[in-house]
Amino acid sequence: MRCSCSFCLAFYYFFPNCSTTVSSPFRHPHLGSRSVQEIGGMDGETGEEGRPMDLRNWHHERRWRPYRADLHREVARLRAPAFARYRVEVRKDELDDPNWEAEADEEESTRPFSAAMATIKKRVEWRKSNPAGAVLGWTPSSRQRLRRAPPLLHLCLMSLVKHGEEIESLEGIPDDLKHKIVSLLCSNRKMNSRILRTYLNGSTTEIHLTDCSWASEDVIQDAFTSCNIDHLRLVQLDLSGRCMPDYVLQTIFAKSQYSFPSLVTLSLKGAYRLTDNVLSVVASSAPCLKSINLGKCSLITSCGIISLAEKLNLTELYIDNCQKIDVMQILPALESMEHLKVLSVAGASTVCDTFISRLMHACGYNMRELVVADCQKLTTKSVRAIGANCPNLRLLDLQRLNQLNDLALKYLANGCRSMTTLKLRQNLFSDEAIAAFLEASGGSLIELSLNNIAKVEHQTAIAVAHGCHSNLQNLDLSFCRRLTDEALGFIVDNCSHLSILKLFGCSQVTEQFVKGHSNSQVRIIGLTGSILDEMEMSKV
């Protein structure tokens, strides 16, 4: 028989070919050449000196220590990937192309990124040879800047939201303003069934409910029963897990075969009780549906997505953090979607280089927005495929992909020249590579996130001020603690259209920058004041 102690059970698991048994001499890893019967302790027998023996006491003998070392080494090897932190200096991309490294090292002096990098290297060398010279040349303004008053619209909306329970009707209010009011009521937890009925009365074409966690199943059913759904083009029912099981959505959509003939956009983000069964009903009732958001719908599987792709001509698909969806299973269906323009697969553990390469080859030319944040298997090879096949890309989210290196920015700069939104949060890019990208292809950027990129420093500040000054409106430099007051002031004063600057975690920033910059339009979030109030103001 086999020993049932914890060590031996683990030993048999990692070394299944070992035929160790407690009754066979010369084979047990920690009993040496003696069998258990000779040693005693398994059935109350005595040991060599007549004392009762416990087999576990032998685990501390030197005879089995080499086996313990092998076991611990195997356990450490299996668990290491969960704790690994990749470093640019030592990481090598494991790619199928044997000529990858040779291609990556080729000097392309005529390409935008390489030309910008050469300029930056000269600037760095000059700085090293002239340490006393001014890096940026920014000096704080001596003029006292007037405190900017909040927009009147924001004050009115927040006052209305504060007294939301007193709202009697939303009639006569323009639709866009009505949607803002309802969104603010949802985010401030002031929404109720009476306001919902008021909101849905009339011939509205859009429903924006960013948080339905307050509602019950009956409230949602009753609201849609009294609503005219014939002209609805957009329905947003986010965070509706509590009130949106299958039968409720089936009741709403199954009134007739084409009960939502005009519906184009449907968002059910966070509806964690929905299953694949309801997706066929949605596809039948809304034949014109082009965009669907199923993010965080944890019960949706690959079969449901394949069914949607076959029945609808989708252009936008959001399947963030859907644990039961294997993207490699739905890849053929996605490749057949010729008009796919927006894809979000953030947090999908099965997204890999092969998936991105094949999909970009099939759909890259039409792709406008791509979100692959937290897809930890992606390497620079995926970014190379994006840069080579997506010339019309407008939004790219590469947050928290710690296997990317500076070459990724080279491929983006040379291939995607018209991006308006780029999110690079918590990556390992160097200061010089980010600066080269921004100088080469940052002119069209409206929103840029460099949150928690440790190496961001003066070269990036110069590139933002020179390369992004014409369009940049939203900039996130939170936790970039190498940026000085001088660097931040240089950015803010040169980017005249900058309206939001996020500086969470930037403890190095002083009053010299806060009171010394000359941009009266910028709103600095994360340093002082009420963070929630400032974030709400930025939405208005």
Give each language-model segment a name:
Residues 1-10, 526-540:
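Extreme C-terminal disordered tails of eukaryotic proteins encode short linear targeting/docking signals used
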Residues 186-293, 302, 316, 328, ...:
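Leucine-rich repeat
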Residues 187-193, 213-221, 243-251, 272-277, ...:
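Short, solvent-exposed loop/turn at the beta-strand->alpha-helix junction
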Residues 223, 513-520:
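Short, aromatic/basic amphipathic alpha-helical patches
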Residues 210, 240, 269, 295, ...:
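The repeat-register position in solenoid repeat domains
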